[in-house]
Amino acid sequence: MTKPLQTGMTIPVFPLPTTVFYPGTPLPLHIFEPRYRQMTSDALEGGRRIGMVLLKPNWEENYFGKPQLYSVGCVGNIEKEIKHHDGKYNFTLMGLRRFRIVSEKEGKLYRQAEIELLEEKNEQDIIEGHQNECREKLIENFREFIGYIPQGNPQKKEPSWDLGNKLSEFVDRFAYQLDLSLEQKQNFLEEQDDLKRAKFLHSFLKMKIELIHLSKMHSTQDPRWN
């Protein structure tokens, strides 16, 4: 029986240089390094959980050692795993919870950490048939943004808005679809306050809209859409 996630437990940690992972979102992974094949094998025999964390800048200098990590990551559950004849794996990691690394543990080829689970703050229910101000404002912002994108551009696509029954779920899955920078993604992950995360996404979309307005002031045709 799989133990429930809890503060104080030790989980495998998989650091990557360009990936920030959110609760409620899927992350397809191809595992080929021997140490991470072992990590996957151990996880499948145990709780099927892996913690994703972002490597700090200059990780290249010590990639096969222990490059520095950001302290906040997201733990996910292994789904749809395939083990290939050469020992490599493909699977999808489904995000579960934000966590903070308390301390790293020795004893494995791969990195492990004792974690503290991070609680959501200012959580709100999203009830079908009832408006949620944060949700509606973000949808309005997004529709305004894609309204400026010419027909035929692949970015002019409205997603499904069925992104969860909690505000935390909605903003995390909404952020997953936006072209945030790596730094913005990590800052968003580290923010536990759901309302502050919603406010950040609102500001991000408003900034994108303002950039389009400024561009149109200088040119009748926005070169970013060429």
Residue ranges and their predicted role:
Residues M1-N226:
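N-terminal low-complexity, acidic/polar interaction/targeting segments
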